[in-house]
Amino acid sequence: MIYRYAEIKDLDEIMGLYKEASLNEWCTWDDSYPDTGICKKDIETESLLCLEDNGTIIAAISFDSDDIVDNLELWNKKYRNKARELARLVVKDSYRNQGIAAKMILKAMAVLKKRGYKAVHYLVSPDNLRAVNSYAKLGFTKAGECELYGYRWHAYEKDLYYIERSITGEFKRTLWNPFVEAIEKYKLIKDGDRIAVCISGGKDSMLLARMLKMAKDYRLYDFSPEYIMMNPGYMERDMKQMEFNNLLFDIPVSYFSTNVFDDVEEIGKNPCFFCSRMRRGHLYRKAKELGCNKIALGHHYDDVIENVCNP
């Protein structure tokens, strides 16, 4: 699947998605909205992101600029003129219930973050219970309720820098400061380093990846990170959850697959030890393939002890 900005040639296909969605009983759209004029404007201003699967557009979302919505009193005042509305989210009926809507929202938020916005907000019909639950899962907070355009809406908003603010604020003394101090003390990063940041899907490596991304974004060090994740044979549902988590943490991950689990299954004795060694070997090879001179692994104290005892 490919995320990309919609083009004029996609107009009819996207309008077809809107039409299909309008037939659902929970949808507030009709024949007059969204119209081709709105869709065309979104395309021309690069404000319409779509998801393509085998040449077919299966989902779309817009980053709208609506003065009426943007100036609602219920929004947090500190984001005034620094927030953008997410609008016209649509997923092809045959692709629903696969988490695609949530991924579209996360992709849109990543785009808006790069454009300098601090927050996003969204109006959703209270009848669309699936969407209401999705926003809570994605960390949106309910700002209130309003009546607009003849409908009742639930209003949600999200700080795009919530994770960064937590790490450098609430957890500054326990996470961010020790992280930076360790890099400085042990000279872990040098100018020009190309570092393969290896993500397993667990909280240790996820946190490490997020903080290294912050170090890069804040230009604390002159290095190039490559975020990689190996699939050693995870179940499909587990892999999808990990992909979702990477989107949620705004980490641009490259994925590659191996047969480690199948190979280890044939080993009767000490499978965990061999699994660890094999996975590490694949990570080293991938890092070299990407031209990296270092790798970064996230370990807690128990991991460190096990690695020292089983080098």
Please report, for each region that a protein language model flagged, where it lies by residue:
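A short beta-loop-alpha structural element at the N-terminal edge
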Residues: I2-G16
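ATP-dependent adenylation/nucleotidyltransferase module used to activate substrates
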Residues: S166-N310
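Conserved beta-strand-loop-alpha-helix junction that forms the acyl-donor binding cleft
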Residues: R96, Y122-V132, L148-R152, N231
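Conserved acyl-donor/pantetheine-binding loop and adjacent beta-alpha core of acyl/acetyltransferases
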Residues: A60-R88, R96
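Conserved beta-hairpin
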Residues: S47-S62
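Conserved acetyl-CoA-binding loop-helix of GNAT-fold acetyltransferases
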Residues: V91, N97-A110, N133-K137
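Conserved GNAT-fold acetyl-CoA-binding loop/helix
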Residues: K19-K41
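Conserved GNAT acetyl-CoA-binding A-motif
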Residues: I105, L112-V124
